Amino acid sequence: LVSAKTETVGINRITVVVDADELNIEQITKQLNKLIPVLKVVRLDEETTIARAIMLVKVSADSSNRPQIVDAANIFRARVVDVAPDSVVIEATGTPGKLRALLDVMEPFGIRELIESGQIALNRGPKTMAPVKN
């Protein structure tokens, strides 16, 4: 579950990712539509959606293994956002699978702290969820 600002001031988009059958998805949609402040419920199809999450992970690091950690982060197109004498903080964005793979690579070094957001998503191509502006 993620709530995020949109291109329209005062309107936030809530992204809810569920693993459910069609009947349960319909029920969730109906319940969301009953909420007064909800303007619109849009169901995104996995094949036509770009979805990403962000993760910050603090990894134990010293002068001997820091280059390996940085190289591994670079392979995943992640960024080192903080370096301390005994740790490195890495910022990564991507699919849950990509983030899990990065964690798997960092695990042997020692994960000291981790926080991961839920996913945000948009349709691929020109289709938008926002009303068309003239």
Which residues does each predicted region cover?
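Long, contiguous binding/interaction regions
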Residues: 1-13, 17-134
